[in-house]
Amino acid sequence: MIKETIGNATLYCADCRDVLPILTDLDACVTDPPYGLSFMGKAWDYDVPGVDIWTEVLGALKPGAHLLSFFGSRTYHRGAIPIEDAGFEIRDQLMWLYGSGFPKSHNIGKAVDKLHGNEREVVATVDVGHDMRSGNYKTGSGNRMIADVTKGASEYEGWGTALKPAHEPIVMARKPFTGSVANNVLEYGTGGINIDECRVDGGRFPANLMHDGSEVVGDIFPKNKKSGVMGDNKQYKGFGKHGIYGQAKDDISHKFYGDEGSASRYFYCAKTSKKDRDEGLDALAINQATGGGGGIGDYLDDVNSASGKYGSEKAPAKNTHPTVKPTDLMRYLCRLVTPKGGVIVDPFMGSGSTGKAAVAEGFGFVGIEMSQEYFDIACARIEQAHKIKAQELF
């Protein structure tokens, strides 16, 4: 076990099952654990965390403390059930929508043509960028890769086996407590969620949906005018049109927020940038990143899907973790469930996105990561976040 302390963050390179039993009085758990998809063949992603781990998390948290945990759309049920079985109350499901996922779909038409020995017609070529490792491609000018887009005559042309991923669900759970929420908050500081500091677009009540602001996601929502404060609300008699009655009916200090608009109604966070991924990693070497996956030929037959990202390996990078979450997204989630001055635990720290976010928000942090490679990346990113936070205070 390796232990590092960076400001108000304590980081362990260890199995979380060895560290969680020694932790107590934590205010929240915000984490992105294995999804049980064997992503990119990674052994650590073979299965979702079991009841034993979530039981230890439960024991480390204060009564009323919240847990937020990402899972994959296919394995959400396998992730949420052990959390509930460990003793947590499932409070909600949050949804993060994004437009950058690639479909890991098997091209049935191409597979049928291959079985029958049929030739496929080349209908177009597309520039799929650099670093393509497999599939039907040839070298173009400037060492860029040009892929043939083909079409067959089989009745199964256009059929595949999977949809394009565009969301990740997040379990919101809470450790049970006795008595009222008010009493628990007064005693432990936990039990509620921070509505006002997570309001969206100048005052909208936070929803259980977040998005990356991409055009493909924005097109889902109807295009209505953007709404802000609806103005002063002055009620004169009894039960007003906004449900105001009693002493508050003549209070013009209350402002009410509209609920028009489109995607602006929900928290927006762009996908993880290279700057966000690699901030603080100047001293680390560039290594081959993992990610992408699949063969070009399976995905680029659909011209609309030929973005150059499908079926590709990621370019070499300093942060080699394949599932880095945006810091702004993690800051929002940390702020949502953590009381002022609280301490957040992440038993599956990865490259430290939750820790980076917690430090930026002024929270304490305890992170646990079993991979030495990712632990070193997390330490560097969190140390940089600590330096930035320290500069803000002076």
Q: Which ranges hold each PLM region?
A:
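Core catalytic lobe of class I
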Residues: 2-394
